[in-house]
């Protein structure tokens, strides 16, 4: 599902909101989440999951075109850990 598909679906379900209002709300929510992670803080949405930063240590990688070794710096990357309710709903698909 793309962001525009999500906006369309939410606007249909919430008839009191226009698509523009839903779009503004989603954009603001995503911006707030990005700002929170950028500040190094964790985001927890109970029943859904949590977003945090994980550190990737420096390592030696390879240039896919030339095959030469390249030293990659350590960096923080966003990480999502699904909550119990979300895991259970997804697991139900497999049974």
From Swiss-Prot:
<comment type="subunit">
    <text>Heterodimer of an alpha and a beta chain.</text>
</comment>
<keyword id="KW-0810">Translation regulation</keyword>
<keyword id="KW-0238">DNA-binding</keyword>
<dbReference type="GO" id="GO:0006417">
    <property type="term" value="P:regulation of translation"/>
</dbReference>
<dbReference type="InterPro" id="IPR010992">
    <property type="entry name" value="IHF-like_DNA-bd_dom_sf"/>
</dbReference>
<keyword id="KW-0233">DNA recombination</keyword>
<keyword id="KW-0804">Transcription</keyword>
<dbReference type="InterPro" id="IPR005685">
    <property type="entry name" value="IHF_beta"/>
</dbReference>
<dbReference type="Pfam" id="PF00216">
    <property type="entry name" value="Bac_DNA_binding"/>
</dbReference>
<comment type="similarity">
    <text>Belongs to the bacterial histone-like protein family.</text>
</comment>
<dbReference type="GO" id="GO:0003677">
    <property type="term" value="F:DNA binding"/>
</dbReference>
<dbReference type="GO" id="GO:0030527">
    <property type="term" value="F:structural constituent of chromatin"/>
</dbReference>
<dbReference type="GO" id="GO:0006355">
    <property type="term" value="P:regulation of DNA-templated transcription"/>
</dbReference>
<comment type="function">
    <text>This protein is one of the two subunits of integration host factor, a specific DNA-binding protein that functions in genetic recombination as well as in transcriptional and translational control.</text>
</comment>
<dbReference type="InterPro" id="IPR000119">
    <property type="entry name" value="Hist_DNA-bd"/>
</dbReference>
<dbReference type="GO" id="GO:0006310">
    <property type="term" value="P:DNA recombination"/>
</dbReference>
<dbReference type="GO" id="GO:0005829">
    <property type="term" value="C:cytosol"/>
</dbReference>
<dbReference type="GO" id="GO:0005694">
    <property type="term" value="C:chromosome"/>
</dbReference>
<dbReference type="InterPro" id="IPR020816">
    <property type="entry name" value="Histone-like_DNA-bd_CS"/>
</dbReference>
<protein>
    <recommendedName>
        <fullName>Integration host factor subunit beta</fullName>
    </recommendedName>
</protein>
<keyword id="KW-0805">Transcription regulation</keyword>
